[in-house]
């Protein structure tokens, strides 16, 4: 017992010394940055990163790179900050660190500070999503998608925000963003189409709960939609009935519904493609023998279905939803 206690105390002392050492190093690096010696400080950060990694001090390396990136961002040094941000990801990958909310929030913070138009940001988010999936082949952790969506929403990048909301579990946030997107960029005649596309895509992703939440929230909060159901817009009534039919799972109801609302469904050629997939997922409709999907259509559907073939360095960039206007 005494030996174990002594070992624990020694470990605590070593940990305290390590933290103290990191803090001293950070102080020196911060002083270099404050003096404007950006290049020298950047190279020092990189040297220390690889030294820590070689010693398997992954947490220290990650924390130092994260604080360094934030420091460079605060001084407008985008390239140096982005480089250290990528090293944060490298430490996570090599240490095989488990996904945790705190880490996802740190990554989202770094993303939010990057130049929205920089290629480094695209590379960072693609790699961050891949790490956050934990090797599951999915398109990234839902919480990280949510955090990215919120940042992009603040930047009024509605299209990319929408993509990330679709891969999160935040139906309410998605609906609120779509209300703003519709009122800011859409035509009044398209208010129903914004939410219809989102609901159909959520269903294609087998996320029935978020599909229902996004529809209810959007129709309640959009200033151009009068109380319902039933609604003035036939397409909204179709979506309302579809969500009820999905709960029931009766193929005859689904088939009649799609036939009756064909005039509304013809407003966007993608609707029937989505409904083919929804029929397979929720109503036991057999898949088509040969796929008619190609080009942009096929890429979009593959992304929405969570195809592992789309899971690569550029999947986030290539899988953005189509514009409505």
UniProtKB/Swiss-Prot annotation:
Entry protein name: Golgi to ER traffic protein 4 homolog
Region of interest called Disordered, as start-end residue ranges on this chain: 306-325
PTM note: Ubiquitinated by RNF12, leading to proteasomal degradation. When unassembled from BAG6; ubiquitinylation is modulated by BAG6 quality control role and effectuated by RNF126.
Domain of life: Eukaryota
Residues spanning the signal sequence: none
Subunit structure: Component of the BAG6/BAT3 complex, at least composed of BAG6, UBL4A and GET4/TRC35. Interacts with BAG6; the interaction is direct and localizes BAG6 to the cytosol. Interacts with GET3.
Species of provenance: Bos taurus
Keywords: Cytoplasm, Phosphoprotein, Transport, Ubl conjugation
Known role: As part of a cytosolic protein quality control complex, the BAG6/BAT3 complex, maintains misfolded and hydrophobic patches-containing proteins in a soluble state and participates in their proper delivery to the endoplasmic reticulum or alternatively can promote their sorting to the proteasome where they undergo degradation. The BAG6/BAT3 complex is involved in the post-translational delivery of tail-anchored/type II transmembrane proteins to the endoplasmic reticulum membrane.
Family to which this protein belongs: Belongs to the GET4 family.
Subcellular location(s) per record: Cytoplasm, Cytosol
């Amino acid at each position: 017992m005494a030996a174990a206690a002594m070992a624990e105390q020694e470990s605590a002392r070593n940990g305290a010394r390590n933290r103290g050492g990191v803090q001293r190093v950070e102080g020196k690096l911060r002083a270099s940055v404050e003096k404007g010696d950006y290049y020298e400080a950047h190279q020092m950060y990189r040297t220390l990163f690889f030294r820590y990694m070689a010693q398997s001090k992954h947490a220290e390396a990650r924390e130092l790179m994260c604080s360094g990136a934030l420091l460079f961002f605060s001084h407008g040094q985008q390239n140096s900050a982005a480089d250290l941000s990528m090293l944060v990801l490298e430490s996570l990958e090599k240490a095989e660190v488990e996904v945790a909310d705190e880490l996802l929030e740190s990554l989202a913070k770094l993303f939010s500070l990057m130049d929205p138009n920089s290629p480094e940001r695209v590379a960072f988010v693609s790699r961050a999503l891949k790490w956050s999936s934990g090797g599951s082949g999915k398109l990234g952790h839902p919480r990280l998608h949510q955090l990215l969506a919120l940042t992009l929403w603040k930047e009024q990048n509605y299209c990319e925000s929408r993509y990330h909301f679709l891969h999160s579990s935040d139906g309410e946030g998605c609906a609120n963003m779509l209300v703003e997107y519709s009122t800011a960029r859409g035509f009044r005649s398209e208010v129903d189409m914004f939410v219809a596309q989102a609901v159909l895509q959520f269903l294609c992703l087998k996320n029935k709960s978020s599909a229902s939440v996004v529809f209810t929230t959007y129709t309640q909060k959009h200033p151009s939609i009068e109380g319902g159901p039933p609604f003035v817009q036939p397409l909204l009534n179709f979506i309302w009935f579809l969500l009820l039919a999905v709960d029931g799972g009766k193929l005859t109801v689904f088939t009649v519904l799609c036939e009756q609302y064909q005039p509304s469904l013809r407003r966007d050629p993608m609707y029937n493609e989505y409904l083919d997939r929804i029929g397979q997922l929720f109503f036991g409709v057999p898949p088509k023998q040969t796929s008619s999907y190609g080009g942009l259509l096929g890429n979009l559907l593959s992304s929405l279905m969570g195809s592992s073939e789309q899971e690569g360095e550029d999947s986030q960039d290539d899988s953005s939803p189509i514009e409505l206007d």
